[in-house]
């Protein structure tokens, strides 16, 4: 499970990305270590990149800093489990080993989908039951319906609030001030 949810547990990364949600002198330029190159040079978030996140929810999800900023926002709303589930499903779809697929599927189900799961996502009864049935023979698509529901929920609910949030607006403002 640790490998599956590693981005959440990487304290150094969380600390550095935490500056996306705080205004302090130490991180007012919104720098973050590249997730694929930890302990290397810092990269600045450009105004263009941050502005593109408003184009669509999928654009936001395709950008590593967009995901980090959205995660920080969701934490303030106590709903980061939705994004964590979506990311876990994306990672799960890359699984090639049948043995690992079954193990990962059960971990994701127990962590996010099952009733009273530690980080239970908000999905309807039919979707939860369909996903439960899919667990009898897990496949790369066993979470597609639940993941789609969570994606829609975030896109229609959390994403518009994120774009209006002080956090996002401050991030845009800070990146624009750097250009001046």
From Swiss-Prot:
InterPro entries xrefs: RGS (IPR016137), RGS_RGS8 (IPR034949), RGS_sf (IPR036305), RGS_subdom1/3 (IPR024066), RGS_subdomain_2 (IPR044926)
Localisation: Cell membrane; Membrane; Perikaryon; Cell projection, Dendrite
SMART domains the UniProt entry points to: RGS
Organism domain of life: Eukaryota
GO biological process: G protein-coupled acetylcholine receptor signaling pathway; G protein-coupled receptor signaling pathway; negative regulation of signal transduction; positive regulation of GTPase activity; regulation of dopamine receptor signaling pathway
GO MF terms, alphabetically ordered: GTPase activator activity
Domain RGS: 56-171
Main location: membrane
One term under GO cellular component: dendrite
Keywords: Cell membrane, Cell projection, GTPase activation, Membrane, Nucleus, Phosphoprotein, Signal transduction inhibitor
Protein's UniProt keywords contain Lipid metabolism: no
Residues recorded as bearing Phosphoserine in the entry: 26
Range of residues in the leader sequence: none
Membrane topology of this protein: Peripheral membrane protein
Function field: Regulates G protein-coupled receptor signaling cascades, including signaling via muscarinic acetylcholine receptor CHRM2 and dopamine receptor DRD2. Inhibits signal transduction by increasing the GTPase activity of G protein alpha subunits, thereby driving them into their inactive GDP-bound form. Modulates the activity of potassium channels that are activated in response to DRD2 and CHRM2 signaling.
Subunit structure: Interacts with GNAO1 and GNAI3.
Protein's recorded name: Regulator of G-protein signaling 8
Protein species of origin: Mus musculus (Mouse)
Protein encoded by which gene: Rgs8
